[in-house]
Design a protein with these regions (language model features):
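Active-site recognition of the HExxH zinc-binding catalytic motif
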Residues: 40-52, 89
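Short, surface-exposed, low-complexity cationic segments
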Residues: 36-38
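Metalloprotease/metallohydrolase-associated module, dominated by Zn2+-dependent proteases
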Residues: 2-21, 27, 55-112
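Helix-boundary and loop/linker segments of multi-pass membrane transporters
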Residues: 32-33
């Protein structure tokens, strides 16, 4: 996974975004992170990359978008954190070995 530092992508309120396997980070945000926070971000985005591969990339973005819309409409408290893809990534972003043991479609499994 390649990390691209820049000042355009993602939008200013976000630090990192994974677009088709390339991770774009806001330069000033990335430079301010501790080494552990950088590692945690890489694990988080690597989990997203595994999710993308399972759903052939386009499927990931379609489902992510619709789940985000649903989470805004139904329980309007922090839709981003309630998206199944994000829940899995946040739960396991501190586990450096998670991807070695991750089950397919873990974002929808209770035992993730």
């Amino acid at each position: 996974m390649r990390i691209v530092e820049n000042n355009i992508i993602p939008f200013p309120d976000f630090g990192a975004i994974n677009l088709f396997g390339e991770v774009f980070v806001r330069e000033e945000w990335w430079d301010g992170l501790s080494p552990w926070s950088k590692k945690r971000t890489i694990i988080h985005e690597s989990i997203h990359q595994a999710q993308m591969r399972e759903l052939l990339y386009v499927g990931f973005y379609i489902l992510y978008f619709f789940e985000w819309i649903y989470q805004i409409i139904v329980p309007p408290k922090g839709a981003y954190r309630w998206i199944s893809f994000e829940r899995e990534a946040f739960i396991h972003e501190n586990d450096e070995e998670y991807l070695d043991n991750r089950k397919y479609f873990a974002q929808w499994r209770e035992d993730r």
